[in-house]
Amino acid sequence: MSQGKIVQIIGAVVDVEFPRDMIPRVYDALKLDENGLTLEVQQLLGDGVVRTIAMGSSDGLKRGMTVSNTGAPITVPVGKGTLGRIVDVLGTPVDEAGPIDTDKSRAIHQAAPKFDELSSTTELLETGIKVIDLLCPFAKGGKVGLFGGAGVGKTVNMMELINNIAKAHSGLSVFAGVGERTREGNDFYHEMKDSNVLDKVAMVYGQMNEPPGNRLRVALTGLTMAEYFRDEKDENGKGRDVLFFVDNIYRYTLAGTEVSALLGRMPSAVGYQPTLAEEMGCLQERITSTQTGSITSIQAVYVPADDLTDPSPATTFAHLDATVVLSRDIASLGIYPAVDPLDSTSRQLDPMVLGQEHYDVARGVQSTLQKYKELRDIIAILGMDELSDEDKLTVMRARKIQRFLSQPFHVAEVFTGSPGKYVALRDTIAGFKAILNGEYDYLPEQAFYMVGSIEEAVEKAKTLN
């Protein structure tokens, strides 16, 4: 095992000199002899010097300190022992519950599955959230992005999806907290503990206060654990269906930008790293379903300044099967979840996958809302009275649909005081179909706000009169 000496320290970037015949490879993990700090090799500068990123605080480091090459990339514990535990980017437990009970470990840098190992599926994943199930349905083994600016509800939507899917889903889940608030990580842990599903979830945290190296690699640590669960075969030779939650994929990009600047690379558009597309591809191509098992991934994506054309969210779009776009305009109307029904998309929105009835209702809802959007300018200038009877009917139904797309969440019960609702897909389709057909034209639009099924709207209308 070769040893080197630190020759330069600039923030999280540490240069180490090794003997010329024992230079480590890119992505090898180096360990500082004094305090065990891990450094990951990023560049070979020549003359035996390698440039590394510290996976922890570089406070107190000085030139001349001895560093040992481990000869392998960062490896993390995997398997059943990680369930119910919180680990950091290096797989070290941070929940004060003792060492992790597993003898298996895996390197965080792995190749994506080969083309002939991949498997495609059209099976739907019911979430119990009306607007998602109807307009941007999720595929089992697919990739979903929750796009939104600051404070429109990405994390709350993510928590509700975890609540509805992870609890009903008998498989295992991995949650990677990438550069998010420590408080949210704490809330998530207690949410899982209170609902007795902690033994089915592995948690990997690299939060906002961590150095950029940790935030850049923590998503790979979580993914490595999820891949192991997917590929581990049971006695019948089958793998598992795993859920992989990432909050937030933008912070992964941001950490890459910080590391890139520290390494002295020339920035590209808007100051992002020149390797943005490649880094995103390396992560996203590994999140996939094979013939052994599947990974269904749900990723929160922060949109800087609500600009969806920003390079970071724009690069993420290309990899996803469904996009759930959260809108500040809809949130300002008090409609939660603030999903934009006209901007959100899904590859599953196809009559061959969903069936003709679901497809027709979804398209009917979208066309009614689109017509209302076009009429709003006329209403603002001339008022409702100038519209034709047909347009008045469209506006009335669209406003009911808009309110019926809202729903009380289980995870928000503490704040709203109204109990959360899980709405089955067949009830969602039946409710919206009835509104489109005019069966509930006689009900006031307030009756449709923050209810679950259409029957609840009818009951609510009785209390309004």
Swiss-Prot record:
Compartments, record wording: Cell inner membrane
The GO molecular function terms of this record are: ATP binding; ATP hydrolysis activity; proton-transporting ATP synthase activity, rotational mechanism
Task: Note the Pfam families from the entry.
Answer: ATP-synt_ab (PF00006), ATP-synt_ab_N (PF02874), ATP-synt_VA_C (PF22919)
Q: What is its main location?
A: membrane
Question: Can you state which reaction this protein catalyses?
Answer: ATP + H2O + 4 H(+)(in) = ADP + phosphate + 5 H(+)(out)
The way it spans or sits in the membrane comes to: Peripheral membrane protein
Q: Which domain of life is it from?
A: Bacteria
Q: What is this protein called?
A: ATP synthase subunit beta
State the gene name recorded for this protein: atpD
